[in-house]
Amino acid sequence: MKIRASVRQICDKCRLIRRRGRIRVICYNPRHKQRQG
């Protein structure tokens, strides 16, 4: 999980999701997981 100031979709399978007020990226590729800190 990468924690970044600006999250973005890396591939076309990445999905932006808002959970508990944080923006997350979930993807089938675990390297693409991100969270906005």
From Swiss-Prot:
Molecular function GO terms recorded: structural constituent of ribosome
A cellular-component GO term for this protein: ribonucleoprotein complex
One BP annotation, GO: translation
Entry's localization field: Plastid
Pfam families, alphabetized: Ribosomal_L36
Principal location listed in the UniProt entry: plastid
Domain of life: Eukaryota
Keywords (A to Z) from UniProt: Plastid, Ribonucleoprotein, Ribosomal protein
Assigned protein family: Belongs to the bacterial ribosomal protein bL36 family.
Stated name of the protein: Large ribosomal subunit protein bL36c
Organism name: Cuscuta reflexa (Southern Asian dodder)
Organism ancestry: Eukaryota, Viridiplantae, Streptophyta, Embryophyta, Tracheophyta
Gene: rpl36
